[in-house]
UniProtKB/Swiss-Prot annotation:
Domain of life: Eukaryota
Name listed for the protein in its UniProt record: F-box only protein 22
Organism: Mus musculus
Any one annotated GO CC term: nucleus
Phenotype upon loss of function: Fbxo22-deletion mice are almost half the size at 6 months of age as compared with WT mice due to the accumulation of TP53. Other mutant mice died within 2 days of birth.
Length: 402
């Protein structure tokens, strides 16, 4: 989605009146441009100064979060992962210019079965090739954060009211595209476990908005390669540095970090660490609920959703997140699938839902809306934030569209 280089004039056979209108009347040009996707707008921005200014104004009006998802229907082709193919096609028609992208894909096909059995060099090459292919589809200035997990939760493209799908096994993925939103700052962060230096400097946390930031509202946090020695303790150490603030904290443990374009050095697929996104801005409202082990049928799941509904988070311009344990899902609900995602849809009919099945969950019951906080972070013990055999459901509202 890069701007095309310079201009190209209008053909001499063009109607002179049309040429005059499209070269001089900004209102008309802007109206025409509202029908074009972002990629086409970036191409025509190089034609002349008038068109460039019109493109800038039109893109400023496109501020809604967009998503691209790939599920069972898109899987099964031999030419690469389904998410790469679907993103390449869908970006031709996306109307926003993404500034930050969060994508998640299933581990089994993003990293092939043969490579998972121990061919480390092949695994590293394949993982990075797939991740690089995906990253190259987005603008160079776009910050891309990508992780791979055992299972994926996606809402099909087209409408936020589409039925979300819990895909516990199989090729799948999604990409959340965040444009630049007035009054909201989204920052990726990454802390790599270094056995020689486990100290987290205050400036590292401040630079990514996790400390000394009165507008911090939400942190999505993910520990990767947590099966390795010391990795889980490192995740606890990182989270403890900002968990006592009045913010929403949600996430979990995933298999691997596959993309982080803001990093200067190539990612080491065998490293362990903590990665995520911080959301800052007074317009943000958010809430989370924890579905504990005793939430094990449709009735108790719906009771949890009622608690989330009671937070009264606006549904417009809101994203739902579901971070579940791999031990839940189909087998946990006595061979009944999609129980939690369906319950979410029942109570939030127009909010798209995304997430994963992972190896541990982070979060608790909490509401952050304006100056009101239910169950302040400093009232929650650290062990109450880390769970297994649970699900974290979260709502993140990014302000009313202007």
């Amino acid at each position: 989605m890069e701007p095309a280089g310079g201009g190209g004039g209008v053909s001499s056979s063009t109607d002179p009146r049309s040429t005059y209108v499209l070269s001089n009347l900004a209102e008309v040009v802007e109206r025409v441009f509202t029908f074009l996707p972002a990629k086409a707008l970036l191409r025509v921005a190089g034609v002349c100064r008038l068109w460039r200014e019109c493109v800038r104004r039109v893109l400023r009006t496109h501020r809604s979060v967009t998503w691209i998802s790939a599920g069972v229907a898109e899987a099964g082709h031999l030419e690469g992962h389904c998410l790469v193919r679907v993103v390449a096609e869908a970006l031709e028609n996306v109307r926003i210019l993404p500034q930050t992208v969060l994508y998640m894909a299933d581990s089994e096909t993003f990293i092939s079965l043969e490579e998972c059995r121990g061919h480390k060099r092949a695994r590293k090459r394949t993982t990075m090739e797939t991740a690089c292919a995906l990253e190259k589809l987005f603008p160079k200035q776009c910050q891309v954060l990508g992780i791979v997990t055992p299972g994926i939760v996606v809402t099909p493209m087209g409408s936020g009211s589409n039925r979300p799908q819990e895909i516990e096994i199989g090729e799948s993925g999604f990409a959340l595209l965040f444009p630049q939103i007035e009054g909201i700052k989204i920052q990726p962060f990454h802390f790599i476990k270094d056995s020689k230096n486990l100290t987290l400097e205050r400036h590292q946390l401040t630079e990514v908005g996790l400390l000394d930031n009165p507008e911090l509202r939400v942190v999505l946090v993910f520990g990767y390669n947590c099966c390795k020695v010391g990795a889980s303790n490192y995740l606890h150490r990182v989270v403890s540095t900002f968990s006592d603030m009045n913010i929403i904290l949600a996430g979990g443990q995933v298999d691997n970090l596959s993309s982080l374009t803001c990093e200067k050095n190539p990612l080491d697929i065998d490293a362990t660490g903590v990665v995520g996104l911080s959301f800052s801005g007074h317009r943000i409202q958010s809430a989370t609920v924890l579905l504990t082990e005793d939430v094990n049928d449709a009735k108790t799941v719906e009771a949890a959703m009622q608690r989330l509904k009671a937070a009264n988070i606006p549904e417009q311009n809101t994203i739902g997140f579901m971070f579940a344990c791999v031990g839940r899902g189909f087998q946990y609900y006595r061979a009944k699938g999609n129980v939690e995602a369906d319950a979410f849809r029942k109570f939030f009919p127009s909010v798209p839902l995304f997430g994963f099945f992972g190896n541990g969950e982070i979060g608790c019951d909490r509401i952050v809306t304006g100056n009101f906080i239910l169950r302040r972070c400093n009232e929650v013990k650290e062990e109450d934030l880390f769970h297994s055999y649970t699900t974290i459901m979260a709502l993140v509202h990014l302000g009313t569209s202007k």
